[in-house]
């Protein structure tokens, strides 16, 4: 399962600001603000942009950096098109994970064949799409906002199945989701930084086919 998670996450140590969010459990008073943030994340049916991913492996004190583009397609799933250090394409939907490598070879895993992977995959989709119902069911939620409009959400899994793969998640942004930091089950941080994010651009025929 750790290999499967790495294939998808495949990510810069957490900053002090990120650590601080876990000192701010979600309260009833802040719940409305959180709802507004998550609603904004879900307003666009499609989001696309560029990503930079830094995966830190503490045992060898090394960072692995990759860059590329992404598409988050509402209820359909997520596309990760890695361009560097080598090209690969990953599509995650509710039913499957599909990967295409640089040579064009395709591999696919169906969720029904691996219930644990299916649960982890659906959780990751919910995190990136701002699915409040799923987040409340599966995570302890922490939330804070800054004077400049920056919001930060901290998530700690409730379920042992998820906690073995993802020990914590921190999301932050202004208008759009800008950064996500996941710590895997071994405490290795994985940082995603998003840029050039646009909403409302429809899927291409190829993208649509990959997510169906």
Identify the residue ranges that each predicted region occupies:
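N-terminal secretory signal peptides
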Residues: 23, 27-72, 77-79, 87-89, ...
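Gly/Pro-enriched, hydrophobic low-complexity segments
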Residues: 132-212
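Short hydrophobic/aromatic-rich beta-strand segments that constitute the beta-sheet cores
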Residues: 51, 78-82, 97-100, 153-155, ...
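Bacterial N-terminal signal peptides
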Residues: 6-14
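An acidic-aromatic
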Residues: 69-118, 190-191, 196
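Sec/Tat signal peptide C-region and signal peptidase I cleavage site
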Residues: 15-19
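Flexible, processing/modification-adjacent segments and terminal tails
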Residues: 20-22, 26, 33, 38-43, ...
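Positively charged n-region of N-terminal signal peptides that target proteins for export
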Residues: 1-4
């Amino acid at each position: 399962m750790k290999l499967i998670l790495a294939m998808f996450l495949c990510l810069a140590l957490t900053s002090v600001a990120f650590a601080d969010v876990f000192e701010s459990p979600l309260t009833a008073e802040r719940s409305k603000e959180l709802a507004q943030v998550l609603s904004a994340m879900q307003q666009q049916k499609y989001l696309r942009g560029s990503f930079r991913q830094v995966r830190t492996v503490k045992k060898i004190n090394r960072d692995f950096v990759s860059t590329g583009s992404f598409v988050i397609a509402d209820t359909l799933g997520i596309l990760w098109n890695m361009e560097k250090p080598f090209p690969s394409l990953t599509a995650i939907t509710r039913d499957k994970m599909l990967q295409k490598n640089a040579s064009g070879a395709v591999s696919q895993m169906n969720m029904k064949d691996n219930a644990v992977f299916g649960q982890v995959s659906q959780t990751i989709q919910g995190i990136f799409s701002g699915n409040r119902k799923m987040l409340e069911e599966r995570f302890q939620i922490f939330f804070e906002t800054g004077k400049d409009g920056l919001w930060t959400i901290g998530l700690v899994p409730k379920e042992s199945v998820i906690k073995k793969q993802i020990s914590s998640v921190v999301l932050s942004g202004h208008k759009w989701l800008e950064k996500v930091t996941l710590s895997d089950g071994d405490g290795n941080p994985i940082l995603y930084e998003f840029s050039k994010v646009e909403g409302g651009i429809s899927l291409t025929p190829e993208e649509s086919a990959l997510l169906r």
